[in-house]
Regions:
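Short glycine-/aliphatic-rich beta-strand segments at the starts of folded cytosolic domains
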Residues: 2-10
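N-terminal/domain-start segments enriched in small and hydrophobic, helix-friendly residues
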Residues: 6, 16, 71
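Short, surface-exposed ligand-recognition loops at beta-strand->loop->(often short) alpha-helix junctions
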Residues: 9-20
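Short beta-strand micro-motifs enriched in acidic
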Residues: 40-44, 95
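Short, low-order "capping/linker" segments at domain edges
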Residues: 91-98
Length: 98
């Protein structure tokens, strides 16, 4: 079953967040299980961003979490945020083309 993790964060340093994501991608090439990431900005709350990460399954997401680079990434990402991040862990029930 596909799995999506949504990470909501507040930051005044979005360019650094995006650079950190690209660095993590390079470090985990060929080993990460994340299939797609989408970084979005809230139009109504300009310092609020949402990262949407898609995985083949919950189990694949967990193996991705155990990569040493992911732990380092999370620690560094926390340092770029204004407050704690909020996580949503979602099992995909259906996907419909619109």
């Amino acid at each position: 079953m596909p799995f999506i993790q949504i990470i909501e964060l507040r930051t005044t340093r979005p360019d650094e967040v995006e650079a950190l994501v690209k660095e993590w991608q390079a470090q985990t090439a060929g080993r990460r299980t994340a299939q797609r990431g989408t970084f979005t900005q809230d139009r109504d709350q300009p310092d609020t961003y949402v990262q949407i990460v898609e995985f083949p399954s919950y189990e694949d997401a967990m193996s991705n979490s155990y990569l040493p680079e992911t732990a380092s990434f999370a620690e560094r990402l926390t340092g770029l945020c204004n407050g704690p991040m909020e996580f949503r862990n979602l099992d995909v029930r259906s996907i419909e083309e619109m």
